[in-house]
């Protein structure tokens, strides 16, 4: 009897480096190491009390059975209502919405339904690790496209034009961006939308961090594009309401694509957890309480960001100033012939010698950098940043 051999479906699949980094930190802490985990990509705040209370009421009322694959109608209706308030074109309706088990599933549904063998899809790089793997699982080819550092690594139509070929079928956008925290302006998004429309590309807009911005708004593509004909917008409650474990996201897309994605989901997870859908409905149905909870969280993130940036700049550490999300993207060193992934080496040494867990930039296809999350208690963030500075200075020497 032979052992397990992976199928050809997953032979090239790489596990999520962000999840792996956090799991490693948790394992070391469980073994007694005083590890500071700055690798996690989730808010360190509790789910708002009003959401918890409504979830409890829904549970008592029997919200424990299957729902439609697309999700409960009241939740889809309020998502559509909120999207329509943003959209500059036609009204968004509930039959354009699918509620998913987190935004990750919504993105996978879209990639798997839109792209296939021979298709190329451009991914802003550095970019979230799962974009590349989802496209590969869909048999499409992810094309890493890099922007200039002076633009916070954001892309322009010129960048896209240089990377595109006759096989290009789409583009993934993420603003605010994971891992850099960069936010695209309205003008920047308008230029990209026009460029993509001229070429009949699909745009997948990942807007999960949109509510977490510090220096002005993070525009939704819904407020830029006049039509949703070749647009998929993905969002959820995980980051803006500290509801990562509830696993609720959604997609907004053309009806024909939505039907295809619903068929796909009917054979994978079916509906997202019923209780979680009711919790998400509570979060979206109480705008005043929701705005207060999100504003309080964002205010604390901003204070942490500012304090950490002050320390890093005083030490002359190269860092991209985040305008949104909750990550610091820090230069670990320059790649050389001997050291091709300085970010990976630095992250390993940081954990082994200084008990600080971060995510190496190789996870985001930029091996000279590391991602540091400040979605952790303030004292942990500040002590972790001090250790990063200490390690960086000693490594350079």
Task: Go through each PLM region and give its residues.
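PLP-dependent class I/II
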Residues: 1-6, 11-16, 21, 26-35, ...
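A glycine-/small-polar-enriched, mobile loop at the entrance of the PLP active site in fold-type I
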Residues: 39-42, 57-76, 85-86
């Amino acid at each position: 009897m032979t052992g397990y051999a992976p199928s050809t479906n997953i032979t090239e699949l790489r596990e999520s480096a962000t999840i792996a980094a956090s799991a490693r930190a948790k394992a070391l802490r469980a073994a007694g190491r005083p590890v500071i985990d700055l690798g996690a990509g989730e808010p360190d705040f509790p789910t708002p009390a009003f959401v918890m209370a409504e979830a409890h009421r829904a549970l008592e009322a029997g919200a424990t059975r299957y729902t439609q694959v697309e999700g409960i109608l009241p939740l889809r209706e309020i998502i559509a209502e909120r999207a329509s308030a943003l959209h500059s074109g036609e009204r968004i309706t509930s039959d354009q919405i699918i509620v998913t088990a987190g935004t990750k599933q919504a993105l996978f549904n879209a990639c798997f339904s839109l792209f296939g063998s021979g298709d190329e899809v451009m991914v802003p790089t550095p970019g979230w690790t799962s974009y590349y793997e989802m496209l590969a699982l869909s048999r499409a080819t992810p094309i890493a496209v890099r922007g200039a550092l002076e633009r916070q690594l954001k892309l322009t139509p010129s960048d896209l034009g240089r990377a595109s070929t006759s096989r290009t079928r789409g583009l993934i956008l993420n603003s605010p961006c994971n891992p850099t925290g960069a936010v695209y302006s309205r003008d920047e998004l308008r230029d990209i939308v026009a460029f993509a429309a001229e070429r009949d590309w699909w745009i997948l807009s990942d807007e999960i961090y949109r509510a977490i911005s510090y220096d002005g708004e993070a525009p939704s593509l819904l407020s830029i594009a006049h039509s949703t004909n070749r647009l998929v917008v993905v969002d959820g409650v995980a980051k803006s309401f500290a509801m990562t474990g509830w696993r609720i996201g959604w997609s907004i897309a053309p009806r024909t694509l939505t039907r295809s994605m619903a068929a796909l989901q009917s054979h994978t997870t079916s509906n997202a957890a019923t209780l979680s859908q009711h919790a998400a409905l509570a979060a979206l149905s109480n705008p005043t309480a929701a705005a207060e909870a999100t504003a309080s969280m964002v205010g604390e993130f901003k204070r942490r960001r500012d304090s950490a940036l002050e320390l890093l700049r005083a030490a002359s550490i190269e860092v991209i100033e985040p305008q949104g999300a909750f990550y610091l993207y820090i230069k670990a060193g320059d790649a050389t012939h001997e050291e091709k992934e300085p970010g990976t080496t630095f992250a390993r040494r940081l954990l082994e010698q200084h008990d600080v867990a971060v995510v190496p930039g190789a996870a985001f296809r930029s091996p000279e950098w590391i991602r540091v999350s400040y979605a952790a208690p303030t004292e942990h963030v500040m002590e972790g940043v001090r250790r990063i500075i200490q390690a960086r200075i000693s490594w350079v020497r």
